[in-house]
Amino acid sequence: MNKLELQKVANEVRKGIITSVHAAKAGHPGGSLSAADIFTYLYFEEMNVDPKDTEKADRDRFVLSKGHTAPGLYSALAQKGYFPVEDLETLRHLGSYLQGHPDMKHIPGVDMSSGSLGQGISAAVGMAIAGKMDNADYRVYTLLGDGEIQEGQVWEASMMAGFRKLDNLVVIVDNNNLQIDGAIDEVCSPYPIDKKFEAFNFHVINIDGNDFDQIDAAFKEAKATKGMPTAIIAHTVKGKGVSFMENQVGWHGTAPNDEQYAVAMEELEKAGEALCQK
C-alpha cells in the first residue's frame, strides 16, 4: 500500500475504535487512537498474515502487550477481514467474542491473550526464541505502552531478547506520554527509553509514530538489522485523530457519550473525505 492508502485505512480503524468504545460504554480510546497508524501499518503492509488461514505456520506473530487498547487491534483486524466490521459494536457485550482484552481462544487473528501489563513482551520473546529454534522465517512484533514499561518484567524479557540476539523480534513502544493517572514522567519516568533498550543490546529507532513515512522507514530498517532485536520508540499523540481527545489523559479509559460520539465521527468522516480528494 502507498501512504495515502494507509492513511485511509487508518482513518477507518479510528472510526471503528470510536464506534466500538461508544457501543460498549467503556474502553480505552486514547491509546487505541494513538497506535492506530502502527496497527494499520503492521496488518496492511508489514506482517505476513492471512485472515483466511489464521494458523498458518509461517505467519508473522503479533502480541498486543498493552492489552487494554484492544479496540485498536480489533478494528484493524476487522478492516483486514478477520471478522465483520459490524461486530465491533458488540465490544464488551455479554456473549460477544470481543471482550475488553484480547483472547487468543476466541478471536481470529489474536496470537496471545494479554491484559496484565508487562507480560506480552515475555510471550513475544518466547515466540521469537521458538522461531530461532525451529529455523522458521516468521517475525514477531509486540506493542507496549510507555506506562507499561514501568513494569520490571519488561526489562527481564528485554535482557533475554538482547542476550539471545533475537533479530526476528521487533518491540514497539507507543510513547504518547500519558497513562491512566497522568503524565508518565510525573508518575514514574521511564526516560530515556532508548538508552534503556540500547543497554540490553537492542537496535533502537526513534520515530513519529503517527507518520507513515517514518513508520515505513523504521520497519524496513528493523528488517535489515541482524544480530540484535529492534525497539521502535513511536512518539505518538494520545487520542490522535479526534481533536478533543488529543493529549487529554481523561480519555485514557473513558467512552464518549452520544454527543461526543457524533462530534468524533463527524471529524473522522471529514478526514476521510479529505483523504479521498487527494
Residue ranges of each PLM-predicted region?
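Thiamine diphosphate
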Residues: 109, 113-116, 121-224
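Short acidic, glycine/serine/threonine-rich loops at helix termini
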Residues: 74-75, 103, 153-155, 181-185, ...
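N-terminal hydrophobic or amphipathic helices/low-complexity stretches enriched
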Residues: 1-13
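N-terminal capping segment at the start of a domain
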Residues: 10-26, 174-176
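Cofactor-binding active-site loop characterized by glycine-rich and histidine/acidic residues
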Residues: 17-21, 32-163
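Glycine/aspartate-rich loop-and-adjacent alpha/beta segment that forms the canonical ThDP
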Residues: 212-278
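Glycine-rich beta-alpha junction loops
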Residues: 68-69, 73, 176-177, 211, ...
